[in-house]
Amino acid sequence: MTALKNDRFLRALLKQPVDVTPVWMMRQAGRYLPEYRATRAKAGDFMSLCMNPELACEVTLQPLDRYPQLDAAILFSDILTIPDAMGQGLYFETGEGPRFRKVVSSLADIEALPVPDPEQDLGYVMDAVRTIRRELNGRVPLIGFSGSPWTLATYMVEGGSSKDFRKSKAMLYDNPKAMHALLDKLAQSVTSYLNGQIHAGAQAVQIFDSWGGSLSAAAYQEFSLAYMRKIVDGLIREHDGRRVPVILFTKGGGLWLESMAEVGAEALGLDWTCDIGSARARVGERVALQGNMDPSVLYANPAAIRAEVARILAAYGKGTGHVFNLGHGITPEVDPAHAGAFFEAVHELSAQYHG
């Protein structure tokens, strides 16, 4: 494979020295960019865009072409590709978000679910990874990703997005055997899917536990973290002569960082409700940290964005082990120039903390 021209993202995850703090942004290929909206219009709809490796590659590279400061690319896809490959029938309702034609409501439903084969059932994702790696040509590392078992389970049981997760939580408390069976099958599926992405060329992977923070502390340990540990235990950790770092991101998980740091991932993602300095004091010996600016800061003027970047860099302090990111994905209404001001500020203001 081509040598990496910029590996500071991977170096920071492995707590090796860097010249500046690396930066990338969740949803960096997304609706805030006019070039993304044009490609999506060309594709016809969101899933057609995900399922076309050439167009998925095009949108993955768009933010890198616009923002030379970006230190990583992230595969353009969706966390719900796995349930879709299990036969749940993913579709998108305008204004409603993702929906499934089939819902999971019983142990019999769960037992009937297949574990998708990455190349056979999700080949379009693997093709996208290969295409992006080829086109990147070593410019920056490529991040692969998946949803966590608990997060995927909520969509499968609810039939789509949910504000209160009532069906998922009812199953969790009423029928824990069924929920564990579903989570176990999803953990197998995610492990196989991420390993497929690593074989295809992903140089780091992130597990998005978007809804882990909706659980009680005890339920989080049993129904979310335990299954992410299974995944981390089953992942390929060396590929192409390099360590493949794993980032674990539970939105709303700031209370549980110590437990998360024991799972074996190289890094933890933080949302914006955490103080990154205290997070470093708690778990910084064991893991790198990624985050954690409030995405809404990008609605403010560039001077205010710069001030918030400076505050977070100072809170983390000197040395490596920090990948700058938002605490969740960028929102569609942000001015692209404000994202550029964010990336510039991270590189410019962080040099003093390194070397």
Curated annotation (Swiss-Prot):
Protein location: Cytoplasm
Group of enzyme by EC: lyase
One GO CC term on file: cytosol
The keyword Lyase belongs to this UniProt entry's keyword annotation: yes
A GO MF term: uroporphyrinogen decarboxylase activity
Binding of substrate, residues: 27-31, 46, 78, 155, 210, 328
Classification via Gene3D superfamilies: 3.20.20.210
Biochemical pathway: Porphyrin-containing compound metabolism; protoporphyrin-IX biosynthesis; coproporphyrinogen-III from 5-aminolevulinate: step 4/4
Site (Transition state stabilizer) residue list: 78
Record's keyword annotation contains Cytoplasm: yes
EC nos: 4.1.1.37
GO biological processes: heme biosynthetic process; protoporphyrinogen IX biosynthetic process from glutamate
Domain of life: Bacteria
PANTHER family attached to this UniProt entry: METHYLTETRAHYDROFOLATE:HOMOCYSTEINE METHYLTRANSFERASE RELATED, UROPORPHYRINOGEN DECARBOXYLASE
Protein's job: Catalyzes the decarboxylation of four acetate groups of uroporphyrinogen-III to yield coproporphyrinogen-III.
NCBIfam families xrefs: hemE
Name by which UniProt lists this protein: Uroporphyrinogen decarboxylase
Organism name: Pseudomonas aeruginosa (strain ATCC 15692 / DSM 22644 / CIP 104116 / JCM 14847 / LMG 12228 / 1C / PRS 101 / PAO1)
